[in-house]
Amino acid sequence: MCNSSSEGKEWTKNYVYKYLRNVPNPKFLDIGTGQGTYFRMLNSGYPNAHWTGVEAYKPYIEKYRLMEQYHTMHNADATELYGKNINVSQLHYDVVFCGDVLEHMTKEKAVALVEKLTSCCGILIISIPIIKWPQHDDTNPFQIHVKDDWSHEEVLDSFHGVIDHSKGDSVGVYIVAGDRYIPKD
């Protein structure tokens, strides 16, 4: 969602700083950039980072000046990341953010996307509503919550490789180990 909940953001920031403490030039993939929340939250701590953004709703790219923030910006649906025009599996990212994205697709598509994303990253960070959270938007079709009833337990059961999490009142943040995960002390 464009106006992302602040719940779990500080925990996420601290987790990323700890995970990347010895990585001088990290690579980030931010799926569903919205306003660029994760970029704004972390960019000052990683001046040499490379940021790739993916945003399905083109007006957000213009409105929030995302082309000026991200080194690489794709106007694409998250489910199109493995097509002929964009294939993120051929790239490596230290951290992939999937914030407020998975509730906008069916459970089956969400599980498939997470499985694909873990093949190209160290960690995948999922931020998702864990209460019934219907959402409709007359101007942005990508804002509709297709699966609006995720629970904490269902997230843990559905996405394999969760190594840590922060459960809030309405939003959960889940760290999923990717194929390139390097355990930290």
Where are these regions (language model features)?
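Class I (Rossmann-like) S-adenosyl-L-methionine-dependent methyltransferase catalytic domain
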Residues: 1-88, 105-112, 116-119, 123-185
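A conserved beta-strand element that flanks and buttresses the S-adenosyl-L-methionine
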Residues: 97
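Histidine-centered divalent metal-coordination motifs
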Residues: 100, 104
